Design a protein with these regions (language model features):
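Charged, amphipathic alpha-helical linker segments immediately N-terminal to NTP-binding catalytic cores
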Residues: 1-27
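C-terminal helical cap/extension that packs against the catalytic core
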Residues: 207-217, 222, 330-333, 339, ...
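Nucleotide phosphate-binding/pyrophosphate-handling subdomain across enzymes
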Residues: 145-150, 157-168, 172-174, 186, ...
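Short internal beta-strands
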Residues: 83, 200-205, 359-362, 382-390
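Hydrophobic positions on the alpha1 helix immediately C-terminal to the Walker A/P-loop
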Residues: 64-68
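Extended acidic/charged loop-beta regions that coordinate divalent cations
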Residues: 86, 130-179, 212-270
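Short, flexible loop segments at boundaries between secondary-structure elements
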Residues: 389-391, 455-465
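ATP-dependent carboxylate-amine ligase catalytic core
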Residues: 21-34, 38-53, 75-162, 178-181, ...
Length: 465
């Protein structure tokens, strides 16, 4: 085995086909062949069989749900792995054990060990290799349980070789339509591809069209379905920029909940209350989904006490999702990148910053529903700065500007992302909210630039005084 440095290991991983960098490709079983993933894992000793797992698919919210679950499992004393993608700042964010990133030297070591086995399996992709790397790390670290987030779709995703204790399907909406299908039913069918025979499914609230597809798929596999909003009920509590609370209860407790509400909280019984640092009503739903999945995992021997769920929810970290970086001026980084998440962002802005003018820093991948995102966001925006992330799929800012001008909003074009953020801060007026959205890659570049630009915020605030 030839030793590698961390940069050499990354170069090796990225030397394979990386579909995340391509705008179009064929989404089929011939291109995404799970047999080759199984072949590689078998050569590595099937590391994925060495730990319990929870599998999370969905269009939106799957990362937040995964982070909430992993944080709670860790709080309960389980040695917990967490695999997510893509990363915002560092490759090592994708693979966590005990909420700690995989060390760079471990990446280099495991990739070097994998190389001869990879050479024996033709056609592997970057994501397939990284998935195998994550499983190998989890096995090497002897984790008790891993939370595994699907990369794309579900049916043909490289993660779909695990046999989980619970399959989780979060909110489904329109994204990756050129790959997964033009209808919500087609998208739901791809996501439902993670359902395994007899393995319980936790399903987030869905549009009826998507719900029916998932229920049919689960029925075919003999997989029981736990529906959040039916089998577990939830409601938001208080919220501010520091976080929010929520209540979760069972249908059997509904009469008690009714009495609690009618008495304005004077009843002796009160529904369980949880606190999360993640903002926006959609995160209340995600927390309820995470709770239902953890409760469902009880039957598989993974018991997380209520106190651990509370502690895990309170300490969960999932950056780039309506994350407030500054309050004066207000600077919010979000990763909304389809129409549904753009709508949720607009609702969150109205909820947390009612009536305040918004400057939007917007960049998107060229394969996303850019007109749909603009239709949701631009009515709430007083000034728009279009920009471009350093990514092969990033849309041309001039094209974004042309689309935006049809909405009658003031548009400025400025790249890179760091320059766009600096301009927004320099021109911020009292009470204005600066928001970045449209792409995970834009969110990542905002977060990367923030430590330096934070000084500009301080100086601008001081000058205003």
């Amino acid at each position: 085995m030839t030793p590698l440095t961390f940069p050499e290991a990354l170069d090796y991983l990225y030397s394979f086909v990386d579909y995340s960098l391509q705008r179009s490709y064929r989404y089929s079983a011939e291109v995404f062949d799970l047999d080759r993933v199984r072949d590689l894992l078998a050569r590595l000793g099937n590391p994925q069989d060495g730990f319990a797992s929870l599998h999370v698919a969905g269009t939106k919210g799957k990362g937040s749900v995964s982070a909430l679950m992993a944080s709670s499992l860790s709080a309960a004393g389980f040695k917990t792995g967490l695999y997510t993608s893509p990363h915002l700042l560092r490759f090592t964010e994708r693979i966590l054990v005990g909420m700690e990133e995989i060390p760079e030297e471990q990446v280099a070591r495991l990739v070097a060990e994998m190389q001869p086995h990879v050479a024996a399996v033709p056609g592997l992709t970057t994501f397939e290799l990284v998935t195998a790397l994550a499983f190998a790390h989890f096995a090497r670290e002897a984790v008790d349980v891993a939370v595994v987030e699907v990369g794309l779709g579900g049916r043909l995703d490289a993660t779909n070789v695990i046999q989980p204790l619970v399959s989780v399907i979060t909110s489904l909406s329109y994204d990756h339509m050129h790959l997964l299908g033009d209808t919500l039913s087609q998208i739901a069918a791809e996501k439902a591809g993670i359902i395994k025979a007899g393995v319980p499914v936790v399903l987030a609230p869905q549009q009826r069209e998507a719900e029916l597809i998932v229920l049919e798929a689960a029925s075919r596999e003999g997989a029981p379905v736990i529906q959040v909003g039916k089998d577990w009920l939830y409601a938001p509590g208080a919220h501010d920029l520091d976080g929010q609370s929520l209540y979760i209860w069972s249908p059997e407790e509904q009469p008690l909940m009714d009495a609690f509400v009618e008495s304005a909280g004077e009843e002796e019984w009160a529904p369980p209350r949880y606190e999360i640092p993640l903002l926006g009503y959609h995160q209340v739903v995600n927390a309820a989904v995470a709770y239902a999945a953890l409760r469902t995992a009880d039957a598989g021997g993974i018991h997380v006490p209520e106190a651990s769920i509370r502690a895990g929810f309170r300490s969960a970290v999932w950056p780039g999702r309506f994350q407030v970086l500054s309050r004066s001026p207000a600077v919010v980084v979000d990763s909304a990148h389809n129409r549904d998440s753009a709508l949720k962002l607009r609702i969150a802005l109205d909820d947390y910053f009612p009536g305040q003018p918004v400057t939007l820093i917007f960049g998107a991948s060229g394969d996303k529903d850019i007109p749909g995102m603009m239709e949701e966001l631009l009515p709430r925006v007083s000034r728009l700065i279009v920009t471009q992330a350093v990514h092969p799929r990033a849309a041309d800012p001039q094209e974004l500007s042309s689309l935006a001008q049809r909405h009658g909003v003031r548009v400025e074009t400025l790249a890179p992302v760091e320059a766009a953020l600096a301009r927004a801060i320099e021109r911020a007026r009292p009470g204005e909210v600066i928001v970045s959205a449209g792409s995970l890659f834009v969110a990542g570049e905002v977060l990367a630039a923030w430590p330096q630009l934070q000084r500009l915020v301080v100086s601008e605030t001081a000058a205003a005084r």
